[in-house]
Structure formats: structure tokens, C-alpha cells
A protein has these predicted regions:
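Acidic, polar-rich N-terminal leader regions of halophilic archaeal proteins
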Residues: 2-222
Length: 222
């Protein structure tokens, strides 16, 4: 995943800001504590990665500073999301590329004044894919295609697939715009965070079984 694509996925969880551990409303008003929200990592187990045929390509954190207002006061809030990225190669036009991608995002909830300010928990998958499009203009022509139930964090969750067109392959190829299948899970509240997963691959391959194996293997480390 390139830097831009990482920022896209990291940005999914930061539109409304994440969860503070141990910060009271009085702390916020007086400004007596630095406001820092950091999600715990979420990862796919080694056995699930091996079963899927994917490999772990990187784990990363993404920190964003936003101004946050409450009780008539405004302060800067530092939000840290955790990303885990997995991929596997495909062969196109006789050349091998990283063609299938699976990303796990853990983003803080931002619980303050008995409210959760991170909107991800209230978004459905249509809203999540719209947010992805806003942050990643190489994906377009998105159409909702199907829904299914898949295991994620120990329970059956809704996963929606979308048909899209995007610049997923290197532009040096004769065809750089390809039809894509995008899998998006609902956001799941776990601990003080929300966890959601995104899988992307060309439509010419069916990676649904592999995506479901990865989903079932996700563990939150909080």
C-alpha cells in the first residue's frame, strides 16, 4: 500500500476523533492534561494469515492532530490510529504485482462527556465507502453489490462488497484502470476502540474465502 492509500485508510477513523483513557470533562475544560487518544493495535493471527495465502506487509500508526470543542472550550487533540496491512501477489500480463490487499484499522472511540465523538461507530458501510472515495480519488464508479455474514472478533458481522473501478495496478501496465471488488466490514466496538476491515482485489480473482479467513483471524490487542 502506498503512502496515499495508507493515509486514506487511516483517515477513515479520524473524521470525528477518538477515545481518551482517563480524561475527565474537568480536565478538558481546565486544560490540565494533554489530550491524547491512541488505539490499541488489531492484528490478524499468524495461522489465519498463513491459511489465507497473504503475508503481513506492514504495521503502522497514524497520528493526526485536530481541534476539538466541548463545553464552550476548544483544544487540540492528538489521535493515533493503528493499521495492519496484508497482501499477496497476482500475475497480470505475465508480471507479478501486489494485487490483493487487506487492511485492519483500529481507531479510538473518543468517549467524553458520556458521548462517543468518533462517528465511525454509527456509520454503515455505504457511508464508509463514501468516505474512502473522498480520501482516495483513484477509486470511482462504486456500486453496492452484495452482503454476507462473516466472523469478526468472535461474532458474525455484516460485510458488504462493492464493485468499483480504480488505479490498483502500476501505471506502466497497458491497462492501469481495473475493475475492483472492495469488501468492507461494519465497525465493531471493542475495548475503547472501533475496529473495521477493508479488502481490495481485482474482480478477475475471487478472494472472498481468503478475506473471510483474515476477518475471522482478527484480534484486538487491548
Amino acid at each position: 500500500m502506498n503512502k496515499r492509500r495508507r493515509r486514506l485508510l487511516a483517515g477513515v477513523g479520524t473524521a470525528g476523533l477518538a477515545s481518551i483513557a482517563g480524561c475527565s470533562s474537568l480536565d478538558f475544560i481546565r486544560g490540565e492534561e494533554a489530550l491524547g487518544f491512541e488505539a490499541d493495535p488489531a492484528r490478524v493471527t499468524d495461522s489465519a494469515v498463513a491459511e489465507s495465502g497473504y503475508t503481513e506487509s506492514r504495521t503502522d500508526s497514524d497520528t493526526i492532530v485536530r481541534e476539538f470543542s466541548a463545553a464552550g472550550q476548544s483544544r487540540e487533540v492528538e489521535v493515533t490510529n493503528q493499521l495492519a496491512e496484508y497482501d499477496r501477489g497476482i500475475t497480470v500480463f505475465g508480471q507479478r504485482f501486489r494485487g490483493a490487499l487487506f487492511v485492519v484499522l483500529s481507531t479510538p472511540q473518543v468517549d467524553l462527556f458520556d458521548r462517543t465523538f468518533n462517528p465511525v461507530g454509527e456509520m454503515d458501510t455505504d457511508e464508509l465507502i463514501e468516505m474512502i472515495q473522498e480520501r482516495y480519488d483513484e477509486i470511482g464508479d462504486v456500486t453496492r453489490e452484495a452482503e454476507r455474514q462473516a466472523e469478526l472478533l468472535g461474532e458474525s458481522r455484516e460485510v458488504v462488497t462493492y464493485r468499483a473501478e480504480g488505479e490498483f495496478l502500476p501505471t506502466s501496465l497497458p491497462v492501469s484502470l481495473v475493475d475492483l471488488t472492495v469488501h468492507i466490514s461494519e465497525a465493531v466496538a471493542v475495548g475503547d476502540d472501533f475496529v473495521l476491515c477493508v479488502g481490495i482485489h481485482p474482480r478477475e480473482i475471487d478472494d472472498t474465502d481468503a478475506i473471510d479467513s483474515l476477518l475471522a483471524g482478527v484480534e484486538h490487542q487491548g
